[in-house]
């Protein structure tokens, strides 16, 4: 109790031991005070004594290592976000390209009413005019009068699918239809089912 009443003795201890005010490299020590919160400490010596200098070095290394880990974690997360942004940009570019192609195909000359689900064949005249026909190059044979540019299937959302992608697109649509039918289907009985809860 005599130590608590003699703050000067505490200052002497601090001066003799030469406690540094703060640790370097970003680390900082807690401020030293003999009366924290206005209350005198029982033993200021045991609470304010200077530690091993190696402890201060370890503290600074720990702070530096924490900074490195935080920076590495932030970099990893930003890398994932950047990859997602790049993927979304590619998807957006493809959506715009498909929309531009579909709009152009809808403006191609055609003497028949186009119906979703059918395949139409795109030809080009010598004059440069493009037109749709329901006659395929195979049906024309060697007597095809114009250049064949490609075949497209008109989907029910009025988008166009190139002939080489029809099978893959139909598989996607079939899978989506299956998922929608399963999610919309309701169970035959709407009453509570207690089967298995009682013997």
Curated annotation (Swiss-Prot):
Coiled-coil region list: 71-101
Region named Disordered: 1-30
UniProt key word Nucleus: no
Single annotated GO MF: identical protein binding
Keywords linked to the UniProt accession: Coiled coil
Pfam families per UniProt: DUF2452
Protein name: Uncharacterized protein C1orf50
